[in-house]
């Protein structure tokens, strides 16, 4: 049985490049003020994994959007509730990604199955 993935049209936007750019800026800003801790290592691993996934991505489909959402949720948890302290530059880069994520990813994301609001 062949499964066809729905490719999501985003008009003129190059979502993969925009995501790669904003996450790379976040990674660069975070690396400047990096203080080793368990949450900081998780955050850096999360950044590296997402950038690796974006390098492999060829098109914008729901799988990519779900990976971006997973990245966002994990990073948001580490920043908001974890012990991760961002310097001012990294915090501003995070806010820029946060804004971009809500503007681009959230409206296009299609979640299948039951949803639980936290």
Where are these regions (language model features)?
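Amphipathic alpha-helical interaction modules
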Residues: 26-81
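Amphipathic alpha-helical binding modules
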Residues: 72-118
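Intrinsically disordered, low-complexity, compositionally biased regions/tails
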Residues: 15, 37, 57, 84-87, ...
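Generic detector of well-ordered alpha-helical segments enriched in charged/polar residues
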Residues: 16, 20, 24-27, 48, ...
